[in-house]
Amino acid sequence: MRKSNYLWLLLVAVLLLPAQEMAAKKKKEKEVTDRELWAGVLYQMAAPVLSNMSEGKLQENMQVELSPTWDGRDKRVTYMECFGRLMAGLAPWLSLPDDDTAEGKQRRQLREWALKSYAQAVDPESQDYLLWRKEGQPLVDAAYVAESFLRGYDALWVPLDSLTKRRYIEEFTQLRRVDPPYTNWLLFSSTVECFLRKAGSKSDAYRIVSALRKVEEWYVGDGFYSDGPGFAFDYYNSFVLHPMYVECLEVFTNSGKNKIWNAPDCNFQRAQKRMQRFGMILERFISPEGAFPVFGRSITYRTGTLQPLALLAWRGWLPKELSNGQVRAAMTAVFNEKGFLTLGFNGSQPHISDWYTNNGSLYMASLAFLPLGLPADHPFWTDAPQAWTSKKAWGGEEFPKDHAYYE
């Protein structure tokens, strides 16, 4: 080979090497599965909270951010919001059995931290004893703690020692001091009482049934409830109304096997169908690029808007119109690993936060990760990704027509 040709080939090889390395890197990055992405994001969200709280250091180390329009309530509500909302989204994942995969090791670590954190939360001697006995706000986030126990009963409630369990029963019971307004707050009382019922403790049936009856009255049609007597176009059907209504009905009626004699219109199976319809609407909200509409209050809760879709997937309740691969692909397109825990919708945007919002509130975002409670070999994770409705529509593909849901 002539020297000039050799030098030319050497130059080409040197120039191509970075490109080849980049291509190999991209290929390696592409090999990250959707489940690995989801698990990584949720671990990143949960680890700083639980690692600190397990040692009683959350309140010492968490930097609190309050809305510029904060209403002056005790800022310590932040820690209860952070912990309760996080655990409501994390509970299904932590309920999976242990294994020696990288994910399994992270999950086991989070569960160990979580169980210690639960104990810290109700120990009056702990620096991380939460604000159970002041303000009305603790009712809200106690409901998310209770919801975490409902969603992960065997993994998160059963292993707690008897003293910690007794303390939770006492804290949940004393929250009857809070008279909830006639809004989604009624479901917070109901969720706490439903957990007490499941745990074999004395529950207040009136607080459960009156809430269920009121929410049933607030159904306005086509998968939507009003949040109180007047309808508001926001995401509270996602954050509270659909999930807690269905889960309370599930507990109180034994999955629809029993009827509520003084509230016969409160029907578990029908509430499921409404949530399925709402899930179909949420799926259509997701744009081809993975964005969703920004409207209504509490938009800083980000992916918490997807909770009904996540709950339907985790519980195996997806309607026939939505496939596993379609829902997983749509939800994965929405997730963003950055900027979860600061006031804002996408990064730091404090002025869009509401008067009741702090950075603990934002852990509502964890509620989109419920499908991690499905094992890795479940069709939700193994089915090939499919284009979701908006992606098909804007891509010029055939897509299903949408029709209103009537009862």
Label each residue range with its predicted role:
Residues 51-74, 124, 330-407:
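CBM-like carbohydrate-recognition segments
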Residues 1-27:
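Bacterial Sec-dependent N-terminal signal peptides
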Residues 79, 90-93, 107-275, 285-316:
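Aromatic-lined, polymer-binding surfaces characteristic
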Residues 99-108:
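Short coil/linker segments at helix-helix boundaries
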Residues 25-82, 88, 92, 112-119:
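Low-complexity, Ser/Thr/Pro/Gly-enriched N-terminal "stalk/linker" regions
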Residues 266, 270-354, 383-398:
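Non-catalytic carbohydrate-binding regions of carbohydrate-active enzymes
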